[in-house]
Amino acid sequence: MLGGRSLPATDLARAAQISRSTASAHIAQLTTSGLVVVERRGRHRFHRLADERVAEAIERLAAIAPAQPVRSLQESNRATAHRAARSCYDHLAGTLGVAVAEALCEAGALDRASLELRAPDRFAALGVEVDALGRGRRPLTRSCLDWSERRPHLAGELGAAMLTALLDRAWLVRRPAGRAVAVTPRGAAGLDDVLGIDVAALAPVAIDRTPLRRVA
């Protein structure tokens, strides 16, 4: 759910490696507390985080939680992919997310201390129409502590719009499972041109040259 998706209880139980009844009990408590929202689609029920603030709280808790042991190559590869680049609710996180936020600060587009917007032109080069944002109740920008980097990445409406733009431009593509996203060759060139980010030198981020089916 940290990826901003709505999922059935069966999928959540499988991911947590618990029974469906146990998962349903936990989901009920989270729903009652207002942390999770239930969406009904016909006879089916899907569950998602209530909003970005819940996702941010989970990221902050994960940043201080002890690391989980890795027991297989598959788990290791998945953990590496998530550390490199992933979605945090609806914005970009991981090593790449932090690098993008820092590059935007270096360019004067964001205030380094608060990540507040300073110059919208740099976002236009990323495909974000800043003038169309900031009309709702959601904060335009928000600093979100990255659990894997222990440094902030950009959240808020602007952070969400930026991730959407990078996906729409095919600079990033979603992995078929989980929250990980991959940088395409086009994205590596674009990030270097606009923000001066050398993706090839940004371990553990790697340029994925394998054609990937875009996942909604």
Enumerate the language-model features and the residues they cover.
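N-terminal helix-turn-helix DNA-binding core of bacterial DNA-binding proteins
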Residues: 1-19, 45-47, 52, 87
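Basic, amphipathic "hinge/linker" alpha-helix immediately C-terminal to the N-terminal HTH DNA-binding motif
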Residues: 6, 39-64, 119-122, 187
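Key DNA-contact positions within bacterial/archaeal DNA-binding proteins
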Residues: 21, 28
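Conserved catalytic core of two-component sensor histidine kinases
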Residues: 24-25, 98
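Beta-hairpin "wing" of winged helix-turn-helix
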Residues: 31-41, 45-48, 113-114, 175-176
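Amphipathic alpha-helical dimerization/coiled-coil segments
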Residues: 55-113, 129-177, 198-216
